[in-house]
């Protein structure tokens, strides 16, 4: 026989809340579940793509490793010759 009063309360109609509105109901041990992202607003499921570069990380990377800059001098000439051969 299982021990009485050791199991949590089961809520068969627990509300899942995202941005202040109920998006679905499910069974849970909590009456309300607050989430930030769900399938209705996640870019993978909605088909939209958002690229946020708020801190300029890509630009900082390009500057740090010298990508995107024009090549000059002997290296540029050597690479031009290599490209011409292929």
From Swiss-Prot:
Superkingdom, taxonomy of origin: Bacteria
InterPro entries cross-referenced by the UniProt entry: Ribosomal_bL28/bL31-like_sf, Ribosomal_bL31, Ribosomal_bL31_A, Ribosomal_bL31_sf
Gene Ontology terms for molecular function: rRNA binding; structural constituent of ribosome
Cited Pfam families: Ribosomal_L31
GO CC annotations, alphabetized: ribonucleoprotein complex; ribosome
Role description: Binds the 23S rRNA.
Protein family per UniProt: Belongs to the bacterial ribosomal protein bL31 family. Type A subfamily.
NCBIfam families found in the cross-reference section: L31, PRK00019.1, PRK00528.1
Protein name, UniProt field: Large ribosomal subunit protein bL31
Gene this protein is translated from: rpmE
